[in-house]
């Protein structure tokens, strides 16, 4: 019995470690967007002064962004301040980011510099 508990505990610990590394190392802070995390595997399609559009297969207009991405955003100190359609507004201090999730496309817009 003790061996089974140890084995299950080890498997859970390894699973948690894998989840942590896969989730938290899949995103990088964006200098342009005040350190807001951006998926490493998202491809920049178009960039303007206050906005960037990424091609990202995990983005969905119907389901938004994956829960792992939400967790990373929250862990970096960004608070969700509202939703409007496909837009979700995040705030950290006096900085606001509008994240728009559409099918296979992620758009980030900063409120002001």
Which ranges hold each PLM region?
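Alpha-helical interaction segments
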Residues: 9-10, 23-24, 68, 79-80
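Short N-terminal helix-initiation segments at or just after the protein's N-terminus
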Residues: 1-2, 34
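Intrinsically disordered, low-complexity regions enriched in Ser/Pro/Gly/Gln/His and often acidic
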Residues: 13, 49, 69-73
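Short, surface-exposed ligand-recognition loops at beta-strand->loop->(often short) alpha-helix junctions
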Residues: 58-64
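Intrinsically disordered, low-complexity segments enriched in small/polar residues
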Residues: 18, 25, 52, 67, ...
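Hydrophobic membrane-insertion alpha-helices, especially the h-region
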Residues: 3-23
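Compositionally biased P/S/T/G-rich terminal and signal peptide-adjacent segments
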Residues: 21-58
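Structured, soluble extracytoplasmic/luminal domains of envelope-associated proteins
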Residues: 69-113
